[in-house]
Amino acid sequence: MSWSWQRRWCGGIEAVIFDVAGTLLDFGSCAPAGVFVEVFAAEGVAISLAEARGPMGAEKRQHVRELLFSPAIAARFAARRGRQPDETDVDRLYAAFVPAQLACLARYGELVPGALETCRVLRARGVKLAANTGYSRDMLEVCLAEARRQGLELDDAVAASDVPRARPRPAMCLLNAARLAVSDVTACLKVDDTVPGIEEGLAAGMWTVAVAVSGNEVGLPLAEWQALPATEQARLRARAVDRLARAGAHLVADSVADLPAAVAAIEARLARGERP
């Protein structure tokens, strides 16, 4: 007879790790998308907002790379330049992206509605609050300053430039968890609006909650979202929910305003001995 033993964390959620743009602040994740369009346009290569949003969640140099080497955009680049793109083009585009992104981040720094109250509720329950992001450290610091200005202080924050390889690999989440000194990775919850961010949380062995409406999948500023007819809101929400659920998110919510209920649902699953 053979035996196998499994350890299970049956306590509650000890830490929530938020993505930044489209999750904690910048409803619609608008800051990065527009800059990618502008940077490629300056090279004489037109890309759509939908194309710019495709790799969202990735480290920003990698985001540039994935855009540039996608078949459709690479073909446009070749038609313009008479050659295929290479890594020197990635370097040049990223070098143009960084100052443009830094220049506009504060304009998109408003917290997602409900974010501050959600964080207050979680703190009152003893939950630690952290963030990680596809932004570089300099970009993240601008976002953190905007969050602090509105009354939100986090316990830890990791930028994509802080780790050797970022999303969808788990390094940022694991660094957050280590610095927060959590009991177990299954006591952590990753909240994100992108597929790479959800995949990152899953790779780290954590619970994941995707936010569908406030983030990249719908991709609209708050005022534009609120102005839509209910039928169009329902269509866009359903499309976003389907994509994020297919990425493996344990739960999908509209925004971080819904997170306390999601945490309660996950804690009930933990109490039953379930694992991510």
Positions of predicted regions on the chain:
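Asp-based, Mg2+/Mn2+-dependent phosphohydrolase catalytic module
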Residues: 1-14, 116-124, 136-276
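N-terminal helical cap/lid subdomain that shapes the substrate entry/recognition surface
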Residues: 3, 9-116, 120-125, 141
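Glycine-rich, histidine-containing beta strand-loop boundary motifs that form or position
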Residues: 28, 133, 212
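Short, well-structured alpha-helical patches and their helix-loop capping segments
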Residues: 89, 107, 132, 164-168
